[in-house]
């Protein structure tokens, strides 16, 4: 079982927001998450990203791999993610 940290789409049509979640890599995008770590609101001007940094680091230490999109979003919000 390979575990990934990725985005889960929520919200209404044309007003998306995403939860940053830990999921099995074979799960569908909107499937059941193992744990929620934070959120990303692309439409908002302020408070676009919130993440529990301790839980994120805990999952990375366990071997979870962040998706490229999650890495890009977190690096953009001044939370450095190693490649």
UniProtKB/Swiss-Prot annotation:
The gene is rpsP. The keyword Nucleotidyltransferase does not apply. One of its GO terms (biological process) is translation. GO terms for cellular component: cytoplasm; small ribosomal subunit. InterPro entries: Ribosomal_bS16, Ribosomal_bS16_CS, Ribosomal_bS16_dom_sf. This is Small ribosomal subunit protein bS16. It holds the Pfam family Ribosomal_S16. Belongs to the bacterial ribosomal protein bS16 family. GO terms for molecular function: structural constituent of ribosome. It comes from the Bacteria. The lineage of its organism: Bacteria, Pseudomonadati, Spirochaetota, Spirochaetia, Spirochaetales. Disulfide bonds: none annotated. Keywords: Ribonucleoprotein, Ribosomal protein. It comes from Borrelia duttonii (strain Ly).
